[in-house]
Amino acid sequence: MPPVVGIGAGGHAKVIIDILRLNGEFDLIGLIDSDPSRLGDQVLGVPVLGDDDRLESLYQDGVRHAFIGVASLAKTENNKRIFERIRKLGFDIVNAVHPSAVVAGDVKIGQGTRIFGGTVINPGTSLGDNVVVNTGAIVDHDCVIGDHSQIAPGARLAGAVTVGEGSIVGIGAAVIQEIKIGDYSFVAAGAAVIRDVPSRTRVAGVPAKPMTSKPD
């Protein structure tokens, strides 16, 4: 099996490690974490090899595959920066799709996308690069999920919903059909979205309404 290195050593990385082991496609050689104090730690038996400076030497040593094991909620633009840096170094950023996920055969999936257990993604849907569809989420037919966006556990998207780049649909939120959510927006947990959400807007409630502050 080809070796793969993970970026991040927290809870998100744990889930990706488990998915990759279940699928049996890669040899998990280690993790990279920006906190130098994590050197030598283990996450589900996978060692932390060092900080970001190790990536270039790993690539030179023949490691060509990486997975993203971080997904910031507070600073979603950081997710884009991490992805672009890893790709610029030359790594193939692998997808992680849990074997229990129900993904229609024609769903388009970008690079570095993670699809967790118990999810349903229906026909005609497109997932961009570095997307997270978290545990138990439902993405119905003909949705478009932009790069670096996250669909949180238990969120439900009806048909033909568009989620822009870097946006987050929170835990248990519901989005009705044909809604458009702009770039770098945030839908709070449990919200019911019945109107379009502009870019860089936070909404919450039932029905969802704009919150007073905007994400950074």
Q: What residues fall within each predicted segment?
A:
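Short glycine-rich anion-binding loops that position phosphate/pyrophosphate groups of nucleotides
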Residues: 12, 71-74, 209
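Alpha-helical elements of the RecA-like P-loop NTPase motor core of helicases
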Residues: 14, 18, 77, 195, ...
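Short helix-capping segments at alpha-helix termini
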Residues: 23-25, 87-91, 195
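Conserved acidic residues
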Residues: 29, 64, 165
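Phosphate-bearing ligand-interacting subdomains
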Residues: 37-98, 102
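Structural signal for interior beta-strand "rungs" in well-ordered beta-sheet cores
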Residues: 95-211
